[in-house]
Amino acid sequence: METQKRHEYHSVCHTCRRTENTRMKVKMMSSSNRVLVIALALTLYIVEVASAETLCGGELVDALQFVCEDRGFYFSRPTSRSNSRRSQNRGIVEECCFRSCDLNLLEQYCAKPAKSERDVSATSLQIIPMVPTIKQDVPRKHVTVKYSKYEAWQRKAAQRLRRGVPAILRARKFRRQAVKIKAQEQAMFHRPLITLPSKLPPVLPPTDNYVSHN
């Protein structure tokens, strides 16, 4: 009887140990899954924060000049009469410096939109009398107001070059322009100071009127 009781006790303890081991394994698996979920959430948050880049001050002006080039740019988007009541004009400084900035947003604040080949061909074929005289007077007002604010930035070109191009402009669209600029700088740097003639000077034949001074 005692042996049977001992055998039953050992068998019960063995089953208890098995159940405890399985419970521990389940707990370990659940904790590892939680750690993986937390790590994935952190990585997604870091990627979102990194993608939402902000530009302020001189970096914002450099980015606008690099994107818009000769077209010029505005700090506040020109609003129409229909959209002035519905939406508030926040401005590029508030959007890029305090929220997030991307290339599409910078393109919206350029003064003149980039015309495609279809638009250029369509405007060249259309003949509109007396309209060019009106269009020529409008941009002059914007140019006088626009470029008078940036004379200080144009004088400090060395500081803009030291800061470099922001990371948001390292897209595929603007890499070709950077390569062209570098090629032009290298061509100007490696230009020879003295250009040697390609042809040798003509050799004169020896003359018979040679006088020896010995």
UniProtKB/Swiss-Prot annotation:
Site note Important for interaction with integrin, residues: R71, R81, R86
The keyword Nucleotide-binding is annotated on this UniProt entry: no
Keywords: Disulfide bond, Growth factor, Secreted, Signal
Annotated segments matching region B: 48-79
GO cellular component, one term: extracellular space
Region annotation (C) ranges: 80-90
Sequence segments annotated as region (A): 91-111
GO terms, molecular function: growth factor activity; hormone activity; insulin-like growth factor receptor binding; integrin binding; protein serine/threonine kinase activator activity
Disulfide bond keyword on record: yes
InterPro entries xrefs: IGF2 (IPR022334), IGF2_C (IPR013576), Insulin-like (IPR016179), Insulin-like_growth_factor (IPR022350), Insulin-like_sf (IPR036438), Insulin_CS (IPR022353), Insulin_family (IPR022352)
Subcellular location field: Secreted
GO biological process, one term: positive regulation of insulin receptor signaling pathway
Domain of life (superkingdom): Eukaryota
PROSITE patterns: INSULIN (PS00262)
Cysteines joined through disulfide linkages: C56-C97, C68-C110, C96-C101
Propeptide: 118-214
Positions of the UniProt region annotated as D: 112-117
Pfam families linked: IGF2_C, Insulin
SMART domains (UniProt xref): IlGF
Family: Belongs to the insulin family.
Functional summary from the UniProt entry: The insulin-like growth factors, isolated from plasma, are structurally and functionally related to insulin but have a much higher growth-promoting activity. Acts as a ligand for integrin which is required for IGF2 signaling.
Protein name, per record: Insulin-like growth factor 2
Annotated source species: Oncorhynchus mykiss (Rainbow trout)
